[in-house]
Amino acid sequence: MINGRRLNEARLTLPMALKLEAELEKRGISVVQTRRRDTLIALHERGPIANARQADLFVSLHTNAANPNWRNGSSVRGVETYFLSTARTEDERRVAAMENDVVRFETATETEKGDPLSFILNDMAQNEHLRESSDLAQLVQGRLRAVHPGPSRGVKQAGFSVLMRAYMPAILVEVGFGTNPSDARWMGSDEGQRDIAVSIADAVLEYLQHYERRTRTAVRP
């Protein structure tokens, strides 16, 4: 909260995404944004935008929120980074359910349902990128941990709709808790957003350089 009110997620994440785009482009990395204004795009439509542009990575920025049933929920804060896989804990399931419900509620539409064959093919495509997604999540979490004023909540996994149709290494970053006053102030500040953008951009560059070296080594005659 800032000045006693909960911040709208898009008011935080859109400026972050634009700053991140600028930092990535400084590092020679081209960026495709799924949206540049506070418009609603169904979760299942975002991955295909990246697929159509043959993107190498998919990064989704979000703000977390405490469960209203938690005691002292407003004190919960910190950063966590997710990749797509089966949730292992109740908290991972909670975050995935929260994110999966947001756009469906706001747009009054259901997440697109595919036929069984499409589901199987999608699962195969995601499994191919599971290790790469986990590696990217580790790098991003490590960089953000160094600048975030709250605790590191670690790298986690869950079934996020926004990641399911991105056929490439993909992560979702819960940058902080909008329900925590300190996290919200930091995420809403120019300095905080700059730290977030620089940290993620540095992690993405490190990831791309690592996998480029690994690919060159693998194909060396």
Q: What is the predicted role of each segment?
A:
Residues 1-114, 127-138, 194, 198, ...:
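Catalytic-core regions of hydrolytic enzymes
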Residues 6, 67-68, 121-221:
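Active-site-adjacent mobile loop/cap segments within catalytic or ligand-binding domains
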Residues 116-120:
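Short, basic/glycine-rich phosphate-binding loops at helix/coil junctions
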